[in-house]
Amino acid sequence: MSRFASLAAFEAALERLPVADADAITAARARQASLTKPAGSLGRLEDIAVFMAGWQGTAQPVIEQGRAAIFAGNHGFVVHGVSAFPASVTAAMVGNFAAGGAAINALAGAAGLDLRVIALDLDRPTADFTIAAAMDETECLAALAAGAAVVEPGLHLLVVGEMGIGNSTAAAALCARSYGGSPAQWAGPGTGVDAGGIARKVAVVERALAFHADAPDTPFEILRRLGGREIAGVAGAVLEARRLRIPVVLDGFISCAALAPLAAAVPAITDHCLAGHCSAEPGHIRLLEHLGLDPLLSLGMRLGEGSGAALAVSVIRAALATHNGMATFAQAGVADGL
């Protein structure tokens, strides 16, 4: 049976969020304090190791089974000229993923991640959200379920990413509705549109917000009206990972925006998440502040497709390597520490 077979099932999952293992956190902190280094000298690497311990429920977490899940979908509003590329590029890039030729293929391989690409009805774009809800209830639940289906017990880490021409416009709409602010504060160049393209994006988001102004302010309604299938897929994967206590690495603006309507209502939804990076999309840093996430990397990336999150896995692996591999003071014969 689908994890999100009904709206009630989705709402129940959002209301019943497991928490990290407090005993594992305590044990991991104790181990950090015993390692042959001054306390705090490895900075955020120490925090990452403790974070991973809490969600894996062990003092010495590992990443033996890591997965990158990339969701793809198309959007009806692209008819308004919001992207530098046609919608056909979404399917072309999915083909490139399958052929092993994309950045995420290289980066997932380098990070030791199993790559899964989930194409969601690419030949059936969402409705134009300036005149209708992007998805009906059934479509949104199906996309959420597709996200949940890629998350399996036994995974040690999940990376989420997306591909969908025009979806930075949907992300801007989700953020503006969830956190306020003008569309101009959230809309950026995306795949590289010029000032005229950004103006078109702002206008489209303004029209969408106006059309849906009287809609219920619930996570599901905001997601189905202003999101997209790949965006709902990311949300479903993150929510299922939480149920299974699997830590998640979020990618850029769009992946994080998938959580905006959920986090605006239930801020704790991001407790099991790390922000892999801060992208060059202007709205991303503002969104990360709302989500309460501090990015691991900031390299000026704006590709999407899980690329920044996959790259950040190397930092997480380094955190676990030091946490698990360093000698303790007792093992090294250092009596009084440093």
From Swiss-Prot:
Belongs to the CobT family. It is an enzyme of class 2 (transferase). PANTHER family: NICOTINATE-NUCLEOTIDE--DIMETHYLBENZIMIDAZOLE PHOSPHORIBOSYLTRANSFERASE (PTHR43463:SF1). Keywords: Cobalamin biosynthesis, Glycosyltransferase, Transferase. The active site is at E305. It catalyses: 5,6-dimethylbenzimidazole + nicotinate beta-D-ribonucleotide = alpha-ribazole 5'-phosphate + nicotinate + H(+). CDD domains: DMB-PRT_CobT (cd02439). Pathway: Nucleoside biosynthesis; alpha-ribazole biosynthesis; alpha-ribazole from 5,6-dimethylbenzimidazole: step 1/2. InterPro entries: Nict_dMeBzImd_PRibTrfase (IPR003200), Nict_dMeBzImd_PRibTrfase_bact (IPR017846), Nict_dMeBzImd_PRibTrfase_N (IPR023195), Nict_dMeBzImd_PRibTrfase_sf (IPR036087). This is Nicotinate-nucleotide--dimethylbenzimidazole phosphoribosyltransferase. It comes from Novosphingobium aromaticivorans (strain ATCC 700278 / DSM 12444 / CCUG 56034 / CIP 105152 / NBRC 16084 / F199). SUPFAM superfamilies: Nicotinate mononucleotide:5,6-dimethylbenzimidazole phosphoribosyltransferase (CobT) (SSF52733). Catalyzes the synthesis of alpha-ribazole-5'-phosphate from nicotinate mononucleotide (NAMN) and 5,6-dimethylbenzimidazole (DMB). Its EC number is 2.4.2.21. The gene is cobT. One of its GO terms (molecular function) is nicotinate-nucleotide-dimethylbenzimidazole phosphoribosyltransferase activity.
